[in-house]
Every structure is written in structure tokens, then in C-alpha cells.
A protein has these predicted regions:
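Conserved phosphate-binding/catalytic region of the ribokinase-like
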Residues: 1-19, 194-195, 222-379
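Conserved beta-alpha-beta core of the PfkB/ribokinase-like small-molecule kinase fold
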Residues: 156-232, 256-257
Length: 379
């Protein structure tokens, strides 16, 4: 199986993360207009699997980095809480099968596994509603403490993933730990969390910040509810990162592609023209692809490049790998594409006219699957 090779010098060898672990259902709404505050609307219950953020990001990282392969492969440790229910057991098994080490995921005796309802419009866009009283909210400082020796041992070679669907206060504690140990701190925030995250100083504890257009507008805009043009957001992000040289930003522009910004400079990577099956999980797939590229030691962006079409791209940056992964992800009805694998991504890129650079090929290798005996058991 083709995977990316983690790079100890100039890249990363493991990821430890907190965020939502759970599952949900998807509805395809009838009609293009946005769901109203007091509206009841028919929708088709889809035969599609929805998942929560840490699971999605962790799955793609584990698959693309070959975490279920040789013992020296990239390690992924999620930290979280699920319910003692069928959904929790199923999610645990799926994450373990993808190659994640589940020793820091525990079950709660009374609270249910995090669940969500995703709704999709006919054009493939949509949103979701996620339970706020699930087992995920029971994540505690003790859970972080249990994983802290691994964070300390990894040091600057470790990625600290900090994504939504767990309390902001715990995310602050996690980022403080990551800062103490020199981890590379990767964050995303839901739209409704941006102001509180700013107030709590979480942005200043971030090395890589991934936002969609609405979330970036809340961070960089002039007034609440205003959604800025993606080009303008990239300009403002460039000004922000010029003053914060440690901060990198990913700004998704939806079906158009994504921007990567660092040190006052940016790159725009266009996405292939597609009719998406579902955009659920696409932003998480984008983030995961970028993290994988950085772990393999390829550049985050090619500064001041702006591709006109995906078909003309020679893929060589972490941003471009992220856009490729996100684009591939929307060809599935599921929030995690069941066929996510590096060789499939490369074939998809070539099918849509892009090519893989020699520098990207050079950080890939064929890896052998490890024994199932090394997979943690659910307790």
C-alpha cells in the first residue's frame, strides 16, 4: 500500500488529538432555500455515514500516513470519550481498524456517544446539528494527563490536533500542554466558537488554523454575520500572519478550492470541477491532507502562486495535497470516503488532469500492514 513517509527532521512522526468522536445520520433536504427558523421540511434519510471531527481528521491521517503499517509508521492517538453503547463500540472498532491507537479513548457508563444530524441541500452543501450533552463533553484533564507522556516524548516531532465538539476549556488545557512540550498545534473552530476562542487566547496558541469562509469571516471580518469574499479573506489573513510569523492558515473557499497563508504570503489551490455527492467532512479532509503533507516534510505552500484550474496543477505542496483529499472526499455520500488511500488520491488527481510532482513522489513508499495483535482492544 502506498503511503506517505513521516519525516523526523522537518516533519512529524505522530499526532495526538482531542475533538468529537461520534456518528450521525444524513438527510437530503427537498428544495434549495436555506432551512428557516420555524420551518418543517421533508428530507430523504440517506444511506450515508456521518462522523464527528476528530474521527474524520484522524482517519484520513492514519490512512494516508500508513498508521496500520510498519511499527515505525506515523502514530495517531485520539483522546476522547464515547458511550457504553452500540454506536460507541462501532466507532471505536472503525477508528482502530483505520490504524489509530485507541488507548486514550474511554467509555462513559451513562452518557451517550456524540451524535449529529447532517442536512444536505441539492447542490451538495449543508450543515449539521451536534448533541451538546454527549459523552464527548465528559473529557477531562485526567484524560489529557494520561496522554501527556506521549506528547512530551514526541516533542517538536508531534502534532497536537485540537478540533471542535469538546469543551473550549479543555481545548485550552490541551493547547497549554502542547505548548509546554513543543508540539505543532493544529486547530479548527466552529463558527459559534470564534469570538470565545479569541477571548480565551486560543488563536495565539495555534500554529496551523483551519477555517471555512464563514469562520474566517468571523475572525477577520468587520461585523458579525458578514461573509467576506475569499480573496479578501486571504489578503486579511496575509496581514495577520505577517505579524504572527508562527501562524499558518488554511481558508476553504468551498468548491472553488482553498488558500494557504503564512508569513504574509499565500497560495490559492483550485479544486477540480465536480458534482459533489456530499460536502460533509470535506473541511476535515482538507485539514488532514495538509497535516499529512507537513508530516512528510513537503512545503506548506508555494508562496504567491494562484492556479487557474486544477487540471494544470503539478501537486507538490501540503495545501495541494489537502485540496486533493477534500476533493476526493466529496465524491462519496459518506463523511469519510471509504476508499481513502494515497494511490486512489493520485489516480483521482491524474483523472482530473493534475500531475504528481517528483518531490511528492519522493516522500511516498510502499508499506506493509502490521499484525492485528498491535491494535488496542475496547475496554
Amino acid at each position: 500500500m502506498l503511503t506517505l513517509r513521516p519525516k523526523a527532521e522537518g516533519g512529524f512522526t505522530c499526532a495526538i488529538g482531542i475533538g468529537g468522536i461520534g456518528a450521525g445520520i444524513m438527510y437530503a433536504l427537498a428544495g434549495e432555500h436555506e432551512l428557516g427558523r420555524n420551518e418543517s421540511r421533508l428530507g430523504e434519510l440517506l444511506d450515508a455515514r456521518d462522523y464527528c471531527k476528530l474521527h474524520i481528521v484522524g482517519h484520513y491521517i492514519a490512512r494516508l500516513m500508513g498508521s496500520d503499517r510498519a511499527p515505525e509508521s506515523f502514530r495517531v492517538w485520539p483522546i476522547g470519550v464515547v458511550g457504553e453503547d452500540a454506536v460507541g463500540r462501532q466507532i471505536f472498532a472503525e477508528m482502530s481498524a483505520a490504524g489509530m491507537d485507541m488507548q486514550f479513548v474511554r467509555s462513559h457508563p451513562t452518557l451517550k456517544t456524540l451524535s449529529s444530524v447532517c442536512f444536505i441541500y441539492p447542490d451538495g452543501s449543508g450543515g449539521n446539528i451536534t448533541s451538546s450533552n454527549s459523552a464527548a463533553q465528559a473529557l477531562s484533564v485526567d484524560d489529557l494527563t494520561a496522554a501527556s507522556p506521549y506528547m512530551k516524548a514526541a516533542g517538536a516531532r508531534g502534532v497536537a490536533l485540537c478540533v471542535p465538539e469538546v469543551p473550549l476549556e479543555l481545548r485550552r488545557d490541551f493547547l497549554d500542554l502542547a505548548s509546554d512540550y513543543g508540539s505543532y498545534r493544529v486547530c479548527s473552530f466552529a463558527l459559534g466558537e470564534i469570538e470565545e476562542a479569541k477571548r480565551m487566547g486560543l488563536i495565539s496558541l495555534t500554529d496551523l488554523l483551519a477555517l471555512n469562509q464563514e469562520e474566517a469571516s468571523a475572525l477577520l471580518g468587520d461585523s458579525p454575520g458578514q461573509v467576506l469574499d475569499a480573496d479578501l479573506l486571504a489578503e486579511r489573513a496575509a496581514r495577520l500572519t505577517a505579524n504572527r510569523p508562527q501562524l499558518r492558515m488554511i481558508i476553504s473557499a468551498g468548491r472553488k478550492g482553498a488558500y494557504g497563508v503564512e508569513c504574509g504570503k499565500s497560495q490559492f489551490c483550485p479544486a477540480p470541477v465536480l458534482q459533489p455527492m456530499s460536502t460533509a467532512g470535506a473541511g476535515d479532509a482538507l485539514l488532514a491532507g495538509v497535516v499529512c503533507g507537513l508530516a512528510a516534510g513537503i512545503p506548506f505552500i508555494a508562496p504567491n502562486e494562484s492556479g487557474r484550474s486544477f487540471s494544470s496543477q503539478v501537486l507538490r505542496t501540503a495545501l495541494e495535497l489537502g485540496v486533493l483529499n477534500a476533493s476526493f472526499s466529496v465524491t462519496s455520500t459518506h463523511a469519510i470516503h471509504p476508499d481513502a488511500a494515497l494511490q486512489n488520491l493520485f489516480a483521482f488527481a491524474e483523472l482530473h488532469g493534475a500531475s504528481i510532482s517528483e518531490s511528492l513522489w519522493s516522500v511516498c513508499h510502499e508499506s506493509m500492514r502490521i499484525s492485528a495483535d498491535n491494535v488496542s482492544s475496547f475496554t
